[in-house]
């Protein structure tokens, strides 16, 4: 496994009875980047994150973090990770700061500065008399995120951190997550079912559906797949690719399957390309300009609705 990956899984599987919640998952989270795990509700995102944190054991497969197997190295690896999985058990009759002080004591976080820094980062006041029971859902989500970053972890694993937030809160969360990565060098794995937010935040995206990883690419690569292009339907895409490279010195294309190829350079003369294909024995049934939105692309890949 590549040491450039902070998280790497190999055939990670979780099975309950005859039902596979996660099936042969291979994800690769690169150092210093934000990885967005995107999928509809029930796709297997939370189960995957729980296995990455040792909260549930995989049925089969392997998790490596910083190049080391998680199993057997939990005491060394897990203290370097901050996580937000479901809702932490905060005390309702204490303030946010008082709650964090208790967790800081349990975790050996040395001083109040770490608590204040975490609260500042998520936009909650350090000196506040409001009890946790009086918090809105959005404030509770912010406090949970503050708890995840309080001990200054190298890696953050955040399950749906924007749940319950209003648009302003979502923008603020997006901003501080980006800051954690860009200014503080954190590696971040974040899950969501909201495509628009993942596409604004993530450097790399993994699409998960019914427990299986359907795609794993950089955001730029996925945007290229969904951008305006010329679609060719023909008898042999491998041969078509060779013709494009040899005759037109062009490699800005993507092969979809044996019979469908997308050319992303719209400046090339389509007529001459079709002629070259035919002269080299290819049967061309379609050559058309096409455009697919990123949302349409994700819906096509996952086979339907469920991603906002």
Predicted regions and their residues:
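Generic structural signal for individual residues within well-ordered alpha-helical segments
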Residues: 78, 100-101, 116-119, 171, ...
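Short, charged/small-residue-rich alpha-helical element at the C-terminal edge
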Residues: 228-301, 308
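Short, Lys/Arg-enriched, disordered terminal segments
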Residues: 1-5, 304-308
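Alpha-helix N-cap/helix-start and coil->helix boundary motif
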Residues: 13, 97, 121, 195, ...
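Non-catalytic alpha-helical coupling and interface elements of nucleotide-dependent molecular machines
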Residues: 105-108, 303-307
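ABC transporter nucleotide-binding domains
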Residues: 4-9, 14-190, 195-209, 213-215
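ABC transporter nucleotide-binding domain
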Residues: 175-264
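Short coil/turn motifs at beta-sheet boundaries
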Residues: 2, 95, 138, 223-225, ...
């Amino acid at each position: 496994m590549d040491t450039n990956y902070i998280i790497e899984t190999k055939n990670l599987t979780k099975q309950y009875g005859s039902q596979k919640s996660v099936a042969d998952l291979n994800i690769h989270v690169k150092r210093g980047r934000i990885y967005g795990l995107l999928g509809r509700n029930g796709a297997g995102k939370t189960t995957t994150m729980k296995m990455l944190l040792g909260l549930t054991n995989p049925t089969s497969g392997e998790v490596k973090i910083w190049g080391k197997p998680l199993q057997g190295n939990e005491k060394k690896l897990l203290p370097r990770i901050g996580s937000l999985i479901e809702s932490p058990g905060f005390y309702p009759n204490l303030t946010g700061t008082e709650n964090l002080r208790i967790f800081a004591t349990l975790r050996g976080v040395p001083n109040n500065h770490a608590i204040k820094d975490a609260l500042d980062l998520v936009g909650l006041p350090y000196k506040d008399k409001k009890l946790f029971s009086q918090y809105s859902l959005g404030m509770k989500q912010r406090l949970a995120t503050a708890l995840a970053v309080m001990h200054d972890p190298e890696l953050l694993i955040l399950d749906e951190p924007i749940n319950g937030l209003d648009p302003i809160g979502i923008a603020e969360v997006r901003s501080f997550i980006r800051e954690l990565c860009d200014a503080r060098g954190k590696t971040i794995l974040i899950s969501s079912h909201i495509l628009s937010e993942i596409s604004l935040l993530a450097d790399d995206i993994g699409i998960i559906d019914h427990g299986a990883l359907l795609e794993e690419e950089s955001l730029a690569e996925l945007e290229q797949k969904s951008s305006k292009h010329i679609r060719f339907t023909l008898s042999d895409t491998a041969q078509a690719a060779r013709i494009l490279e040899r005759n037109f010195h062009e490699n800005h294309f993507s092969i979809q399957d044996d019979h469908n190829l997308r050319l992303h350079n719209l400046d090339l003369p389509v007529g001459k390309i079709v002629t070259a294909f035919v002269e080299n024995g290819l049967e061309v049934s379609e050559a058309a300009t096409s455009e697919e939105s990123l949302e349409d692309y994700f819906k096509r890949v996952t086979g339907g609705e469920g991603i906002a």
